[in-house]
Amino acid sequence: MLQVATPTATEETQTVIEIEGRASLKGEVRISGAKNSALAIMAGTILCSDDCRLSNLPALADIDKMCQILAAIGVNLERDGDRLVVDSSNVGHGPAPYELVSQLRASFFVIGPLLSRLGMTKVPLPGGCAIGTRPVDLHVRGLQAMGADVHIEHGVVNASIKGHSRRLTGAKIYLDYPSVGATETILMAATLAEGETVIDNAAREPEIVDLANFCRSMGAQIRGDGSSRIIINGVEKLHSTDFPIIPDRIEAATFLCAGAITHSEISLFPVVPDHLASAIAKLREIGPEVAIDAPDRVRLIPRDLRGTDIETLPYPGFPTDMQAQFMALLAVSEGNSVVTETVFENRLQHVAELQRMGANIKLKGNAAFIQGVPFLSGAPVMSTDLRASAALVIAGLAAEGKTIVQGLRHLDRGYEDIEGKLRKLGAKLTRIEQPVTL
């Protein structure tokens, strides 16, 4: 008898996080170095031809990618745990391979240092999270104001200093929007420019201040960082430095939400409480108390949860990078809440995944209207971007039953061993390989 073989599905695997919800948390979380600060500072090491030694560097996929990008343009790197020694003495003009740059928006940060130090560069247009267009026009206009010739050809930004001058020229630059990336690009380029550069309507984020502190540690003359006007007086050369990265305020806020949603008392160390001011204020509105036990330590004290309204704004307003995590918390907070996203378009994709878990959320434009429910239900969910992935983990901690979070490449870009840190607090979650049927 002729037997016909039955086709079998090809099995591949994907890495997921499996969460058993409703576990109480307790203990202390060690907060890693700030990803967004580290990426800009790593690019800033190009400004100096001597060694730069960085510490408190987080172990993240984005940091790995930036190391690869720097190495591809001739930078020598030696990494040991959270320490990184960078030697940019032989850096080239670029461009870095597009397959690397396309995965990391922060790769574009190298344009300012390369142009200012070498007089010309080629940098591919960047990639990263799919949360809006986030164009680089403000970066480009700032460099042009300082005397750069910039044009885009075949997806590559070509920048050079006009005429016979080997240095950019200081300029007064007004940013139409207080863009963090544009502020960082112009600030770094201005450190080696001739004369004074003034950035008006500059971004005020702590990561800007950290970058300015790093540049000052190399001999740059910068004042006003942390305000809307930054003034940079260019110098001819920068020198080597040892510099620690600040703690990650977004990671800290994420763990505060994890404590609040599980009604658990947890401590965070090290942190800079001032960097968490808006998150702490909103947590107190929602119900939990945040005690500042030391200059670098905070403690989440659980309380009943109630709804509140949140609108994302540039710093010192409520950060867009904390919006998704707080939405997960508000989904199980009594009463009504409205979360309005004003910084990025297309950054409410996590709503559909929270709805799969039983959240009562309705979208209208850039606003999410939330009616709190008593509990969420575990479900398979898909991460859509970095902070959305953290929000789904937080939701899974509070959900009844099992939650499977897929799309971990987003999570690994911005959180160092989040499951290990949560397990240490008592959460029941593990990273597993799960078959995918094609």
UniProtKB/Swiss-Prot annotation:
Subcellular location: Cytoplasm
Broadest EC class assigned to this enzyme: transferase
2-(S-cysteinyl)pyruvic acid O-phosphothioketal: residues carrying this PTM: C129
Protein residues bound to UDP-N-acetyl-alpha-D-glucosamine: R105, R134, P135, V136, D137, L138, D321, V343
Pathway terms, separated by semicolons: Cell wall biogenesis; peptidoglycan biosynthesis
Source organism, top-level taxon: Bacteria
Residues holding phosphoenolpyruvate: K35, N36
InterPro entries xref list: Enolpyruvate_Tfrase_dom, Enolpyruvate_Tfrase_sf, MurA_subfamily, RNA3'P_cycl/enolpyr_Trfase_a/b, UDP_GlcNAc_COvinyl_MurA
Known catalytic reactions: phosphoenolpyruvate + UDP-N-acetyl-alpha-D-glucosamine = UDP-N-acetyl-3-O-(1-carboxyvinyl)-alpha-D-glucosamine + phosphate
GO cellular component: cytoplasm
E.C. numbers: 2.5.1.7
GO MF entries: UDP-N-acetylglucosamine 1-carboxyvinyltransferase activity
Residues forming the catalytic site: C129 (proton donor)
Pfam families with a match to the protein in the record: EPSP_synthase (PF00275)
Swiss-Prot/TrEMBL GO biological process terms: cell division; cell wall organization; peptidoglycan biosynthetic process; regulation of cell shape; UDP-N-acetylgalactosamine biosynthetic process
Role of this protein: Cell wall formation. Adds enolpyruvyl to UDP-N-acetylglucosamine.
Family note: Belongs to the EPSP synthase family. MurA subfamily.
UniProt-recorded name of the protein: UDP-N-acetylglucosamine 1-carboxyvinyltransferase
Species in which this protein is naturally found: Synechocystis sp. (strain ATCC 27184 / PCC 6803 / Kazusa)
Organism lineage: Bacteria, Bacillati, Cyanobacteriota, Cyanophyceae, Synechococcales
Gene, per the UniProt record: murA
